[in-house]
Structure formats: structure tokens, C-alpha cells
A protein has these predicted regions:
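Ferredoxin-type iron-sulfur electron-transfer modules and their immediate structural context
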Residues: 41-53, 105-106, 118-219, 231, ...
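Cofactor-cradling patches in redox/metallo enzymes
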Residues: 81-131
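Short acidic, S/G/P-rich loop/turn micro-motifs used as interaction or catalytic elements
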Residues: 49-58, 73-74, 99-107
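Short helix-loop-beta junction
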Residues: 58-67
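Short hydrophobic beta-strand segments
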Residues: 39-48, 92-98
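Non-heme iron-sulfur electron-transfer modules
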Residues: 1-6, 10-34, 179-183, 214-240, ...
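Long, compositionally biased charged/polar accessory segments in the mid-to-C-terminal portions
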Residues: 65-66, 72, 88-91, 97, ...
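Short, compositionally biased pre-sequence/patch detector
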Residues: 77-78
Length: 334
């Protein structure tokens, strides 16, 4: 039904036909043609092709500046497309829904629209600018219609789902002053930051290994953990993978584009140097942790074995063979 495509923050799952970019281009060109024809204050009404009769009834009750965009399923159009419409001339985006739709669709639609409305509110824009229009409510009266123009026409937005969304959000925030630069979002929002309790982090890189978007990454040159906020989808995999439990997720929106896109170091250490060749090879905290945990183990009963942990991969092998050559009988102890 398309709900998974709307809920997916990375576009790993997306509607294939039409794909999101084609839908956005269609809406952008429809709005451009409407403006060229002299139309004012266009409102986009996203309708499902499964409910044609109800769509016609809704349009009869709405003013002429409401433009229907028919899709196979309402949830097949994601939050990036909604905001793309706003930065291409639309004054409002509505969904022609019914309370008799499957609860799965209603739940996902409410969740995603709720996040969009929170973002709008942070920019001082009326929450109703993106809203669900339940057709049954038309019997009670006309819905709240927004006619304030944002005076934007960005055209086709480039990149993946998140890049297109943030392009639209940055354009809106450039014309509006956000309430605050950093504002908390609901717990289900796929935008936010990750913080690290540095004193307990060993830089094992388990979080980097599981991060699906490379929001958490390392440069491979030094023992450091880097983070790009715009790429974080708040999936929680890093939090679950961390053996020391030092990572904390915070859903929020950082409206400062440069800060959000910048790779920041959330933890770094001086590299431990091999005690034989002095080559940097691992975080010092990890070496200390391994030595403390393995001290007393039967395979690390002597100081020589403990010291090998503080050696690089090459020197460790050399030291083992030197020890075996000096005292071959010691191997019989194991």
C-alpha cells in the first residue's frame, strides 16, 4: 500500500512506479503551468485513484485553486514530496483521506504528517499547511485553507530522499527565521544527533560497523569517531551495538545547515604506540581495557603475554615466535 515507502527515511524502500522523483517533477510542472495560466495560491490535494467518487465530491466542496494530484496510494508520496510542493509554489498540501481507510495507512499518515507539522511549527508556519483532509468532515464545513505564498520556485530537487527534503527545508528556513536553531522533535522523528560518553568509549567502532547511512564513521587515519547529523536517521542500531552503552540518541532539528552537514568529532584519543616498534596501531583505552580484562586468564598468565596486547600485529607475531624459539617446552603447558 506504500506505507513502508513513506515511513522509510532513507528511500531504501521506495515506490517504483512512479518513483518519487518523477512524482515530484510532475507536481512541480503542474504548479508551474498553473502559475503561467494566471492561477493564484495553488493548494495541492493528493488523492488516491481508488476513491475517485469521493475525490470528485471533495473537489466540488473546495475552491478552484485546489489542484488534485492523483496517486495510486496516499502513502506512496513521502515527506520530501510534500515540502517539494511548498518550495515550488504550493501554499498548502492536503491529503484526501477517509476514516474508513485501513488503520495502517491512517497511523503512518498521521505519524508522518505530525512530524511535518512539527517542522512547520518550528519555522513559524501554520501547521495546517500540511494536513489530512478527511472527506467525512466536509459535511461539517469547509476545511482550513492556507493561502500564504512562500514565493519559492526551486524546480526539480536533486539527490536522495533526505537530500531533497533538507534542500526544501533549508529554502523555507532561509525565508523564515526558525524559532530556535536547535529544536527537539518527537521520539519517532528520523532526524537528530548522537552523543558519546567519552570516558567509557573504547573506540571499538561497533557503531560505525552497523550505521546504515555512515552518519557515524571514522577517517581511518586516527582513533576518532566522527558524526554527520544530517545523515542520522535515529534508527538506534549504534546504541544497541555499543558494548559499553555510551551512545545516546536525541531526536531534534538543527536549522543551521553548516553545522548539520559538517562531520564533527564526537570522540578521539591518542593512538597507542607499539611497545616494540612504536608504530601507532589502536586506541590506548582499548589496549588498557583488554589488558585489564585478560589479566589472570590462563592464556595470559605471564607478563610477556599481557605485553603482546600492547604490540602491533607484526610485532606480536614476531614476539610469539621469539618466545617459542627461546623456550620450546613452554608450549606444552597449554
Amino acid at each position: 500500500m506504500g506505507t513502508c515507502a513513506t515511513a522509510c527515511p532513507t528511500e531504501a524502500i521506495h515506490y517504483a512506479l512512479p518513483n518519487p522523483e518523477d512524482t515530484q517533477k510532475f507536481i512541480e510542472r503542474t504548479l508551474a503551468n498553473y502559475e503561467q495560466a494566471g492561477g493564484l495560491d495553488p493548494i495541492v490535494l493528493i488523492c488516491s485513484s481508488r476513491h475517485e467518487i469521493y475525490n470528485v465530491m471533495a473537489l466540488k466542496a473546495l475552491p478552484d485553486n485546489v489542484i488534485p494530484i492523483v496517486v495510486e496510494e496516499l502513502p506512496s508520496v513521502g515527506i520530501d514530496t510534500w515540502f517539494a510542493a511548498l518550495v515550488n509554489g504550493a501554499t498548502q498540501v492536503l491529503f484526501a483521506a477517509s476514516r474508513f481507510m485501513p488503520q495502517t495507512i491512517i497511523r503512518v499518515l498521521n505519524s508522518e504528517v505530525g512530524i511535518a507539522q512539527e517542522l512547520l511549527d518550528q519555522l513559524g508556519i501554520a501547521k495546517e499547511t500540511i494536513d489530512i483532509l478527511y472527506l467525512e468532515s466536509l459535511r461539517e464545513g469547509a476545511p482550513t485553507l492556507c493561502t500564504e505564498s512562500f514565493d519559492l520556485a526551486l524546480g526539480d530537487l536533486q539527490g536522495n530522499k533526505r537530500q531533497r527534503l533538507f534542500t526544501a527545508l533549508d529554502a523555507l528556513s532561509a525565508s523564515r527565521i526558525p524559532v530556535e536553531n536547535i529544536v527537539e522533535l518527537p521520539a519517532n522523528a528520523p532526524y537528530g544527533t548522537v552523543s558519546c560518553e567519552n570516558k567509557d568509549c573504547t573506540l571499538c567502532m561497533s557503531c560505525v560497523a552497523v550505521c546504515p547511512t555512515r552518519a557515524l564513521h571514522t577517517d581511518g587515519q586516527s582513533p576518532s569517531l566522527k558524526f554527520v547529523e544530517q545523515d542520522c536517521i535515529q534508527c538506534g542500531l549504534c546504541e544497541k551495538a555499543c558494548p559499553e552503552k555510551v551512545l545516546t540518541l536525541t531526536p531534534r532539528m538543527n536549522w543551521v545547515k553548516e553545522e548539520r552537514q559538517k562531520a564533527v568529532v564526537i570522540h578521539e584519543e591518542k593512538a597507542a604506540e607499539c611497545i616494540r616498534c612504536h608504530k601507532p596501531f589502536a586506541p590506548q583505552s582499548m589496549i588498557d581495557m583488554l589488558q585489564n580484562k585478560l589479566r589472570g586468564h590462563s592464556h595470559f598468565s605471564d607478563e610477556a603475554a599481557i605485553n603482546r596486547i600492547a604490540m602491533c600485529e607484526d610485532c606480536r607475531v614476531i614476539d610469539m615466535f621469539e618466545s617459542m624459539a627461546a623456550d620450546p617446552m613452554s608450549q606444552l603447558k597449554y
